[in-house]
């Protein structure tokens, strides 16, 4: 697999490069960075003390011309620009970017009619298995239990709630026959009145170097059930992204998520 990495000088980008270099079935074909980055022109493996022969570049057209897959954990506007180039060059996409608006997500879904892509706010196998647990739990606790989602991330994360927290909320809402827009409450402040039992509450914590902690609380009378996933490093995200790329090898077009990749549907 000839794989290019977008956001190659960032925390996640470096983890992805390391994973690609370690994978026997993958070759690093490109390393894309933002225009103006001081790392442009440097070898993509310099942070590992390795020479890959692949220099960091801001030329998306060149990157897509040399790669069969592009793994993108950047920001929505950047990902959509990369999507346009991927469509022109018939490059398969693995997208782990979070913070998309609904119209932007619609653009990703539409692209699946022309190229194969996996889009997921979290590529971790553990998180996606957790989604199945939440689907089951939500059906059992649909009545008489208040649902709250608490997430914590590092101080540099720019969007809230996290994409994973929103995925959890969407999973719970769908399992109970609703949409998240109908029942989400984001943070509370001041005199809010009594809790509406039909809502799903979200709380976001930002601090330090927390990779990603997510807890869903089902609070009933006399008992509480908590389902928690904690990420100790970004390795699980990188390995999940490679697994998604391998999945795409068998598809020419289509819009998929990690539930498809893992056979959890």
Swiss-Prot record:
Coiled coil: none annotated. NADP(+) binds at residue 34. InterPro entries: DapB_C, DapB_N, DapB_N_CS, DHDPR_bac, NAD(P)-bd_dom_sf. CDD domains: DHDPR_N. Pathway: Amino-acid biosynthesis; L-lysine biosynthesis via DAP pathway; (S)-tetrahydrodipicolinate from L-aspartate: step 4/4. It catalyses: (S)-2,3,4,5-tetrahydrodipicolinate + NAD(+) + H2O = (2S,4S)-4-hydroxy-2,3,4,5-tetrahydrodipicolinate + NADH + H(+); (S)-2,3,4,5-tetrahydrodipicolinate + NADP(+) + H2O = (2S,4S)-4-hydroxy-2,3,4,5-tetrahydrodipicolinate + NADPH + H(+). It is found in: Cytoplasm. The keyword Oxidoreductase applies. The active site is at residues 153, 157. GO terms for molecular function: 4-hydroxy-tetrahydrodipicolinate reductase; NAD binding; NADP binding; oxidoreductase activity, acting on CH or CH2 groups, NAD or NADP as acceptor. GO terms for biological process: diaminopimelate biosynthetic process; lysine biosynthetic process via diaminopimelate. GO terms for cellular component: cytosol. Keywords: Amino-acid biosynthesis, Cytoplasm, Diaminopimelate biosynthesis, Lysine biosynthesis, NAD, NADP, Oxidoreductase. It is an enzyme of class 1 (oxidoreductase). The keyword Membrane does not apply. (S)-2,3,4,5-tetrahydrodipicolinate binds at residues 154, 163-164. Its EC number is 1.17.1.8. NAD(+) binds at residues 7-12, 33, 96-98, 120-123. Catalyzes the conversion of 4-hydroxy-tetrahydrodipicolinate (HTPA) to tetrahydrodipicolinate. NCBIfam families: dapB. Belongs to the DapB family. This is 4-hydroxy-tetrahydrodipicolinate reductase. It comes from Burkholderia pseudomallei (strain 668). The lineage of its organism: Bacteria, Pseudomonadati, Pseudomonadota, Betaproteobacteria, Burkholderiales. The gene is dapB.
């Amino acid at each position: 697999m000839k794989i290019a990495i977008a956001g190659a000088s960032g925390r996640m980008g470096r983890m992805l490069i390391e994973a690609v270099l370690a994978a026997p079935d993958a070759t690093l074909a490109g390393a894309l960075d933002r225009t103006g980055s001081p790392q442009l022109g440097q070898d993509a493996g310099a942070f590992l003390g390795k020479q890959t022969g692949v220099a960091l570049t801001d030329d998306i057209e060149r990157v897509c011309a040399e790669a069969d897959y592009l793994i993108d954990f950047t920001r929505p506007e950047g990902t959509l620009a990369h999507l346009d180039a991927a469509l022109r060059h018939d490059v398969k996409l693995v997208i782990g970017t979070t913070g998309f608006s609904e119209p932007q997500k619609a653009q990703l879904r539409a692209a699946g009619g022309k190229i194969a892509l996996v889009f997921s706010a979290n590529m971790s196998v553990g998180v996606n298995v957790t989604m199945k647990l939440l689907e089951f739990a939500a059906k059992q606790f649909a009545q008489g239990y208040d649902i709250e989602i608490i997430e914590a991330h590092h101080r540099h994360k720019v969007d809230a709630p996290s994409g994973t927290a929103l995925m959890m909320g969407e999973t719970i809402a769908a399992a109970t026959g609703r949409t998240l827009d109908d029942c989400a409450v984001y943070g509370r402040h001041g005199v809010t009145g009594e809790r509406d039992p039909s809502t799903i509450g979200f709380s976001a914590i930002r601090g330090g170097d927390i990779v990603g902690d997510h807890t869903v609380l089902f609070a009933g009378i006399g008992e509480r059930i908590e389902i928690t996933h904690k990420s100790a490093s970004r390795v699980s995200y990188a390995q999940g992204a490679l697994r998604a790329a391998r999945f795409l090898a068998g598809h020419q077009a289509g819009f998929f998520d990690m539930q498809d990749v893992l056979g959890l549907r």
